[in-house]
């Protein structure tokens, strides 16, 4: 009887440590460990587990497809669908392979904006602010998450002014026309130029899209490593000893940082 009670206590303690370890790791590790937990756990509460998520979090937006690990930064479907459609226009699906949405790039961006990338307050973000050179990179006084929120809002503003509808409801050519206006600096950001420029938003959007397509699946993009497969990129191989010793061409299946296929 005593042995049984001891076993129950041991199991309870182990379960407690597992639970608190995951929770504490999510807090200490920030968005990285939060992403790991959200990516690997397949529980019913996965999508509702982030603070502040609204009831529409679990619904299927146009940008989610069948892949939905849960969102951290984007709290409603409309905003997420808008940025998803913009990313799809930058990296569209074609006969060569899937596009940004199917590859999970919008979820990659969601995770990045919820972490230090989006909250880049330590990157010399205090004034005075001067006009930067093109070679100096990102110069806005807004942190990246703020610039993305503003940019998404202005996508809809431009869409309604030009086509009397929200951006996510437009056809591909209309979306391209609006994105081109941002790329060329013609769109109105609704704020002074020294606060944010449309081309700044477009550059970040384009970079985030490409990164989401080709990043390690650990970061929620490059779903099933399809981005790597299109490039025949081997990913993170432990060694190439066997391949070095052979005279024939060897096809190597890509490997992620952790585990097998994601």
Place the predicted regions along the sequence by residue:
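N-terminal export signals
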Residues: 16-38, 171
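N-terminal low-complexity, Pro/Thr/Ser-rich intrinsically disordered segments
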Residues: 54-69
